[in-house]
Amino acid sequence: MNIHEYQGKEILRKYNVPVPRGIPAFSVDEAIKAAETLGGPVWVVKAQIHAGGRGKGGGVKVAKSIEQVKEYASSILGMTLVTHQTGPEGKLVKRLLIEEGADIKKELYVSLVVDRVSQQVALMASSEGGMDIEEVAESHPEKIHTLLIDPQAGLQDAQADDIARKIGVPDASVPQARQALQGLYKAFWETDASQAEINPLILTGDGKVIALDAKFNFDSNALFRHPEIVAYRDLDEEDPAEIEASKFDLAYISLDGNIGCLVNGAGLAMATMDTIKLFGGEPANFLDVGGGATTEKVTEAFKLMLKNPDVKAILVNIFGGIMRCDVIAEGVIAAAKAVSLSVPLVVRMKGTNEDLGKKMLADSGLPIIAADTMAEAAEKVVAAAAGK
């Protein structure tokens, strides 16, 4: 689950990470009032969407008067902001953050992610803040410093100081940088975040260390123990299909293709999408019905896929381990009838009760295209989507 910048800064503030004073605004009038409350002479008007690259897209403006705050708030609120992370369709801006200006002397970068290989937390830091870390990694990889943190020990003072110096923090500001880094780590750990990023972490002219931005992503499987994080959820920023899928415990992600995919198991789902692409097709979604799929879940999965007008064919690829093929077949038949299926349907089943499942499909009277291998299924569904 993602949250907005101003919400991320609320979290950082709780963990003693210095952030600028700022007030969220949902209208132009609220933006003006926020600016007046903060006082000048400089304010930053920031679009609040769940995507990076807002500055380059015109979603961050520096205002030097209340009139400019009004002007920028009017132009940003309601705009469709397109960045490299939103895709060409962009995101509608419904919230702003009005923030006091900062005296930026140097911009730094710091982030935390889970390193699954080492089973530790990876801290990445760079002296090249304020830009995409991917660009830094490509052009100046030597400027990215990585530290693996033992979760049982946490981020130690000496480690934080060493990283701070490596990214160019002067000695006089190292204690402040240590506080910011350790606060970020503690916030990351205690909220079950999967990513926490400050870009940029700035040094001001008088040597202060301040988090000028905040990005958090949380492990959805851990949200049950963080109601305070769930309260930050903004459904307007999420795909309506993915919200609907979550109601039925379906793992669904919208994609840009025209072939709907219904698979049990995340690994098999990814392999299925890869195979579709290998045969020249484009998946319209990732959809994992899990190991406990019921007729209701399969029916809802079909409804979700068919709400996408771009879907021209559907591939059901099932491995019957925990899930029996006859149960899936029953669900597929019921779902196809319930939604009056109007696009070609390719089904491939392997595993428990495979023969029974195939017989049920064959006897259903539905125009189902059968396949024995994943390659055959992918080839057939790509052809069907192309109208061949």
UniProtKB/Swiss-Prot annotation:
ATP binds at K46, G53, R54, G55, E99, A102, E107. It comes from the Bacteria. Pathway: Carbohydrate metabolism; tricarboxylic acid cycle; succinate from succinyl-CoA (ligase route): step 1/1. One of its GO terms (cellular component) is succinate-CoA ligase complex. Its cofactor is Mg(2+). Mg(2+) binds at N199, D213. Heterotetramer of two alpha and two beta subunits. NCBIfam families: PRK00696.1 (NF001913), sucCoAbeta (TIGR01016). This is Succinate--CoA ligase [ADP-forming] subunit beta. It comes from Ralstonia pickettii (strain 12J). The gene is sucC.
